[in-house]
A protein has these predicted regions:
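Short acidic, Pro/Gly- and aromatic-enriched capping/linker segments at domain boundaries
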Residues: 2-25, 192-196
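Short non-domain terminal segments
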Residues: 10, 87, 236-237
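Non-heme Fe(II)/2-oxoglutarate
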Residues: 17-115, 146-149, 153, 159-168
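Long, compositionally biased, intrinsically disordered segments
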Residues: 2-5, 39, 245
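Catalytic core of non-heme Fe(II) oxygenases with the double-stranded beta-helix
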Residues: 108-213, 217-246
Length: 246
């Protein structure tokens, strides 16, 4: 592989059309179609690097395999966020950012209970900081699933206990206690109400507030594949920003 191919520089659409999808009061998801000028280059890079994807590293909770994005890719994504997105989330400036290529691979039967329920990305952030997140869909088959957004239906203490038990109980015990079955969350349940979602589409990029509970919506896992050319490949970004001054 040439050095240029290994670095896999990406170029974002310089004139993006940004659609706002309202979710709940004060929360929205931004959707940008045709986000990259040559998205197939990133897929080819992921395929060439397939052996370097790993499970259980970078994020032990992720139901698949991950590969850190290159410095050039991360810089390009951060530049796009800073120019086109940051102010829409009232973020003053980016303090830290990282990105990675991700392939969802785990079938429902192999998921742990904490993977059966939606989650937030901004755990343990100081009050003066916020986190925004992004997902770039790099697959053509919409059946591999988009992203759904949720709000809690129960008091904070009950939700905290739910997450605690999801990490401690066996799948059978968790399902018995909470009435939640194995699988990726795709609809409301007794603990979370679905408030909206975005369908997957080739070269579609979404941004959302990381505090918003969300989940990959994968109704059937039969087509999940570890091959970047066939599987649910995404580029995921996480942006820790300083909140505006009061």
């Amino acid at each position: 592989m040439s050095s240029a191919a290994a670095d896999c520089p990406i170029a974002f659409n310089p004139k993006p059309r940004i659609e706002r999808v309202d979710l709940i009061s004060g929360q929205a998801c931004l959707v940008i179609d045709d986000a990259l000028l040559e998205p197939e280059r990133l897929v080819a890079f992921a395929a060439a690097q397939q052996a370097r994807f790993r499970a259980g590293v970078f994020n032990a909770y992720y139901p698949g395999i991950l590969l850190p994005a290159t410095a050039d890719t991360t810089a390009a994504l951060q530049a796009f966020f800073s120019e086109h997105v940051r102010r829409r989330f009232h973020a003053r400036r980016v303090l830290h950012m990282h990105s990675r290529l991700a392939i969802t691979t785990q079938p429902a039967a192999e998921l742990r209970p904490y993977q059966w329920i939606c989650h937030s990305d901004n755990v343990d952030l100081p009050a003066e900081h916020s986190m925004q997140a992004s997902v770039l869909y790099l697959f053509h088959n919409p059946d591999l699933g988009g992203t759904g957004f949720y709000e809690p239906r129960r008091p904070r203490g009950e939700i905290r206990q739910l997450y605690h038990d999801a990490g401690e109980l066996s799948p059978a015990d968790f399902s018995t206690r909470y009435g939640i079955e194995p699988g990726y969350q795709c609809a409301s349940n007794e603990y979370f109400r679905r408030v909206g979602g975005v369908d997957a589409k080739w070269n579609r990029l979404i941004f959302y507030d990381g505090s918003m509970p969300h989940s990959a919506e994968i109704p059937t896992t039969a087509k999940l594949d570890a091959d970047p050319r066939r599987g649910r490949l995404t580029l995921n970004g996480f942006f820790t920003s300083r909140r505006p001054l009061a």
